[in-house]
Amino acid sequence: MEFRQAYYDEPLIKDIKSDTSFKLSEDVDENLLPQDMRRTDLKLPQVSEVDVVRHYTRLSQMNYTVDVGIYPLGSCTMKYNPKYADRIASFAEFRNIHPFQPESTVQGTLQIMYELQEFLKKISDMDAVTLQPMAGADGEFTGILIIKKYFEDLHEDRTEIIVPDSAHGTNPASATMGGFDVVEIPSNSEGMVDLNALKAAISKKTAALMITNPNTLGIFEQNITEIAKILHDAGALLYYDGANLNAIFGITSPGLMGFDIVHFNLHKSFATPHGGGGPGAGPVAVKSFLSDFLPVPVVGYDGKRYFLDYGKKKSIGRVSSFYGSFSILLRAWSYVIRNGDDGLKNATIRAVLNSNYLKKKVEGYYEVPYYPLKKHEFVLSTEKTGRRALDIGKYLLDFGIHSPTVYFPLIVKEAMMIEPTETVSKDDLDRYADVLISALKVPEDDLKSRPRNTAVSRIDEVKAARDLKVRW
């Protein structure tokens, strides 16, 4: 399939002038008003509907989305976003409600939020949920604040959070923002948590371990129940980063593994749109002994009506305005309703199958480090090929294929992190493998000249970072 991305020298919408626009006649002749009482024209775009449509259509043609093709950005779960969820979220009954309305007038909305809380409790095998956090990192920070408040309530001075060297970068960042010191521990030769290193790192100052399972190498932490016991025996907590939840739906759960706190990325695992800075939603679930520390309000139900419950005396308080990113919560609710238990489990099975199928297709050409069996994603290394992961990622773009995540996790040199998700076909995977393999066969100068078929070719990324010019 040939690919050439559209390119337009498109101005900002405020700079578009349209001769098809017109002004309504004035009710009062302007000449009758004193000069000092006349308003100057507002600097609003004077564009017609067709000009607006064409402007944003052209911009979309210079972009790449999951609606265009495969988007295997590792650890991001860029699955297709079903349009039925968008339609439900666009209903006027939802768009026109206001957070200040009396509870009696929004019972249906509160019911949906309550049901989503119950769905997330069941999926994670946890006991209580807040829907307030507006993103995954926001959910992490909420979890960190709960951990902090919990130990303050126990009058225990625990100041350290442990993270593996394969952790998401947001884990140490969230812990630091919460006032904790970060202790990093190495992975073992199979890419999993080194238990001896964990035991050596734990002390009376340890508050929690933050971990993703499967981890960022796509490997399931086989010793997770032992890890949980080590933490709990030391009086510490176990935190589940839900970035890779798509790999375990219906198979296992954080609660069964021994986790105390979980954050969800609804904008990933639950197929809601994300990217470009938003939108997102990062609900947090906890075991019962931590439920009093959740942000308020949560949605309650007394058997007759739904209500906003502010009755948690040990709450960390609000973590967002009002009640969360409702349009994303609504999409996630509809996704769970539509799929049910069997559908969610099937999504996981297909995601893991697609990942391992693609890995098998390319592992004779690229090194796949660490333990061989992967889950929903895997990491390649281009180091032994003599070619840079960055160059191969750019090469892929010329075939209408999005690059995987490169140079992460940091413990793999020249890393390419690939997560196909369950919503791609075998044909997509075969073509992706063919292009990955062909990237090793083209001349080096050809590889470094890519991409050539995209709207924008290579940019000077160092200069862009150092000489930042923000426009809006």
UniProtKB/Swiss-Prot annotation:
- Per the similarity annotation, which family is this? Belongs to the GcvP family. C-terminal subunit subfamily.
Could you tell me which residues carry N6-(pyridoxal phosphate)lysine?
A: K268
- Organism whose genome encodes this protein: Thermoplasma acidophilum (strain ATCC 25905 / DSM 1728 / JCM 9062 / NBRC 15155 / AMRC-C165)
Q: Which NCBIfam families match?
A: PRK04366.1
What is the recorded function of this protein according to its Swiss-Prot or TrEMBL entry?
A: The glycine cleavage system catalyzes the degradation of glycine. The P protein binds the alpha-amino group of glycine through its pyridoxal phosphate cofactor; CO(2) is released and the remaining methylamine moiety is then transferred to the lipoamide cofactor of the H protein.
Q: Its catalytic activity?
A: N(6)-[(R)-lipoyl]-L-lysyl-[glycine-cleavage complex H protein] + glycine + H(+) = N(6)-[(R)-S(8)-aminomethyldihydrolipoyl]-L-lysyl-[glycine-cleavage complex H protein] + CO2
Q: What is any one of the record's Gene Ontology cellular component terms? A: cytosol
Listed GO MF terms: glycine binding; glycine dehydrogenase (decarboxylating) activity; pyridoxal phosphate binding
Could you say which EC number(s) this protein's record lists? Answer: 1.4.4.2
Q: Which cofactor does it need?
A: pyridoxal 5'-phosphate
Output this protein's name: Probable glycine dehydrogenase (decarboxylating) subunit 2
Its GO biological process annotations read: glycine decarboxylation via glycine cleavage system
Q: Which CDD domains match?
A: GDC-P (cd00613)
Q: Which InterPro entries match?
A: Aminotrans_V_dom, GcvPB, GDC-P_C, GDC_P, PyrdxlP-dep_Trfase, PyrdxlP-dep_Trfase_major, PyrdxlP-dep_Trfase_small
Oxidoreductase recorded as keyword:
yes
Enzyme class, UniProt record, top EC level: oxidoreductase
Organism lineage: Archaea, Methanobacteriati, Thermoplasmatota, Thermoplasmata, Thermoplasmatales
**Any one Pfam family match given in the protein's UniProt record, by short name:** Aminotran_5
Q: Which UniProt keywords apply?
A: Oxidoreductase, Pyridoxal phosphate
* SUPFAM superfamilies found in the cross-reference section: PLP-dependent transferases
Subunit details for this protein?
A: The glycine cleavage system is composed of four proteins: P, T, L and H. In this organism, the P 'protein' is a heterodimer of two subunits.
